[in-house]
Amino acid sequence: MQIFVKTLTGKTITLEVEPSDTIENVKAKIQDKEGIPPDQQRLIFAGKQLEDGRTLSDYNIQKESTLHLVLRLRGGMQIFVKTLTGKTITLEVEPSDTIENVKAKIQDKEGIPPDQQRLIFAGKQLEDGRTLSDYNIQKESTLHLVLRLRGGMQIFVKTLTGKTITLEVEPSDTIENVKAKIQDKEGIPPDQQRLIFAGKQLEDGRTLSDYNIQKESTLHLVLRLRGGC
């Protein structure tokens, strides 16, 4: 059958393959056509990086499927992933790796399914389809891994005008995450938000569970006046 391989330069290569061909075989065919050594090739299909020992049929790659070829930067880089238990995992990655790829590597090392992983860097939750370089994650950067509790929960946020906003959250969400969700719904920048629960102002770096905020709790939103303290 024929498949297509699209490079980052936009060039498309046509290959004659069999469903039983391994990814390694495919890389050899690409080398024959383009002169790129297999160890510098990374093949992506449906957002997944393909492993050398697996076959096209393992990945359900059928005739006229398009694979994406990304060149592996020599050497790649190491990053660290710190879990809530304090354990630090070291990963070999490339700047062009997607967050989804990184979660797959964490699954390989730790057995945690990607859909239960949330990765945080510089206070931001990282989105699956974006790459490390999109977030300016460089060698020896540290990401934080938070486990997503299945199902999450609803909380309410009441504004001074009396309006109540409903949010879908997880106990492990930081206050910063909650402010980002409020910004998404209401357009209020996080730096203008102050959140109050049980008479306490909530700090950005802490989580809902730190403050014992449970399902259907109500937070109060006070707007911070520009230039105020």
Swiss-Prot record:
Name any Gene Ontology BP term: regulation of mitochondrial membrane potential
State what changing S65E does: Phosphomimetic mutant that binds and activates PRKN
Q: Site Interacts with activating enzyme: give positions.
A: R54, R72
MF terms from GO for this chain are:
protein tag activity; ubiquitin protein ligase binding
Crosslink site(s) for Glycyl lysine isopeptide (Lys-Gly) (interchain with G-Cter in ubiquitin)? K6, K11, K27, K29, K33, K48, K63
One further remark on this entry is: Ubiquitin is encoded by 4 different genes. UBA52 and RPS27A genes code for a single copy of ubiquitin fused to the ribosomal proteins eL40 and eS31, respectively. UBB and UBC genes code for a polyubiquitin precursor with exact head to tail repeats, the number of repeats differ between species and strains.
For this entry, the protein name equals Polyubiquitin-B
**Protein source organism:** Homo sapiens (Human)
Q: Which gene encodes it?
A: UBB
